[in-house]
Amino acid sequence: SAASEGYKRQLEVHTVKGEDLTIIGCIGDTVRVDPKLFEVDSSVEKVMHVQEPYKLVNRAFHPDDTVVDVSGVKVGGGHLALIAGPCSVESEEQVIEIAKAVKASGANMLRGGAFKPRTSPYSFQGLGLEGLEILCAAREETGLPIVTELMSPEYLEIFDEKVDLIQIGARNMQNYDLLKQLGQTKRPILLKRGLNATYEEWMMSAEYIMASGNPNVILCERGIRTFETYTRNTLDLQSIPVVRKLSHLPVVVDPSHAGGKWWLVDPMAKASVAAGADGLIIEVHNSPETALCDGAQSLKPEKYDTLLKEITGIAKAVGKEM
């Protein structure tokens, strides 16, 4: 109708084709939109206002689970992503040794920090571009897609060229200029939840990335700050079913940063899979006692191997494929 054509010119329209129906989402100022103008069309089943400020991320706009492809590894939709590796890239020998070990255990992606955002300016800041080349060498050696953190837009072009899954850390979850820049790449984005972020704030950060043109977003729960100081953070297991209710995006869990202690990783990883997580990102180091970063929360390769064997039954029980 003329009215609907007029609205179309004022609003941004997104079409999502599901298995049973097609959803047309109108994004913009919809306050003055009269649903009755659309309900008279026999091909329209119903018209509804989405109350939440995030639209593209919202399950109401996209009922089917999104499956993100990371260089051939599926995340979401019944696939369990297993991401593992050292907190920091320290040397080529170290990374390749760990990469081979975690792959043998069943991991399907390799993590490693080349650029490290540290609370203290005196802590190890990472090897930078040299570390990125080491990760690429490990991928060449093992075939594992690589996951590493982008801290600044100035490196986006090289990350777009070399990195399979670009991680945005908790500190940058609300760095909106950086999030908007991520629309320039079609590389998948792993968006970690900020340590003080509400669910809505987390969803809105994902919305920034998607609204800028990149639909390939994976959410990551890594623990939030509470009054408790015994653990590094508090893992919000509720976030897994909450996110699955609010959004169609896959959600993975980082039990290493959540607890900050290696012996907490095992039970929290198992609990995360049981709660419906689409993946785990776990720090593994062949010599945690000499690690340059976060050795206390890293598993040794043999412990990681045991963990994955024990997770298999849990994953099967909740319909996840390892």
Where are these regions (language model features)?
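Short, small-residue-biased leader/transition segments that mark boundaries at the very start
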Residues: A2-Y7
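N-terminal amphipathic alpha-helix/helix-capping segment at the start of soluble metabolic enzymes
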Residues: E52-I83, K309-I311, K316-M322
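Catalytic alpha/beta core domains of metabolic enzymes, predominantly
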Residues: V70, T185-V284
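Active-site mouth loops of central-metabolism enzymes
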Residues: H79-E97, S120-Q125, P145-E149, G169-A170, ...
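Glycine-rich, proline-tolerant flexible connector loops at the mouths of alpha/beta enzymes
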Residues: R111-L129, N286-S298
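Alpha-helix-loop-beta-strand connector modules within alpha/beta enzyme cores
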Residues: F124-T148, Q181-P188, L237-V252, Q297-K320
